[in-house]
From Swiss-Prot:
Pfam families, per database record: UPF0262 (PF06793)
Record NCBIfam families: PRK02853.1
Lineage of source species: Bacteria, Pseudomonadati, Pseudomonadota, Alphaproteobacteria, Hyphomicrobiales
Source organism superkingdom: Bacteria
Family stated for the protein in its record: Belongs to the UPF0262 family.
Organism: Rhodopseudomonas palustris (strain BisB5)
Annotated InterPro entries: UCP032146
This protein's name: UPF0262 protein RPD_4278
Length: 163
């Protein structure tokens, strides 16, 4: 008896946009992180809204009030679902993430390789924590893999950060 895995080839994001009104002022380092995260996310991801059937999907991310908004649509623009998630579980993680990112960007200009590596390990650890939190918050709503969660967390951080 064989168990077949679901075909996830169409369960993916093909386009992602960020609500421009939600984006805080940011420097070139943050803009670079955002561009890389969007590119990497569209290139490879697993994104399967529960009960929506096969994709592909587009995703618009924004902040409305104190909530994170995931506006999910089909590739042709037809609405699928909008999820609103509380930002509370992300506030401390995003704050810590940007504090360590600031240290990292300063360190790569002046610090020793060992110090840069130590800061980068801390940065990755906080990023992983945010990614796991996002997976937990989306559980039962949208199935995503860890790498997709990492890229989405980067984008959430850009929205959440108010410089």
């Amino acid at each position: 008896m064989s168990t077949s895995q679901p075909d996830d080839s169409n369960n993916r994001i093909v386009a992602v946009t960020l609500d421009e009104e939600s984006i805080g002022r940011s420097g070139p380092d943050i803009e670079h992180e955002r561009a890389i995260a969007i590119y990497d996310l569209v290139e490879k991801n697993l994104f399967a809204p529960e009960g929506a059937g096969d994709g592909p999907f587009t995703l618009h991310i924004g902040i409305t009030g104190s909530r994170l908004m995931f506006d999910i649509r089909r590739e042709d623009g037809a609405p699928v679902i909008t999820h609103l998630l509380s930002l509370s579980p992300f506030r401390r993680i995003v704050k810590d993430y940007f504090m360590i990112c600031d240290s990292y960007y300063q360190a790569i200009r002046t610090a020793t390789p060992d110090k840069i590596e130590a800061i980068d390990m801390g940065r990755r650890g906080i990023h992983d924590e945010g990614s796991r939190t996002l997976q937990e918050r989306l559980s039962g709503k949208v199935r995503i893999d860890f790498e997709t969660a990492r890229r989405l967390f980067t984008l959430i951080s850009v929205l959440h950060w108010k410089g």
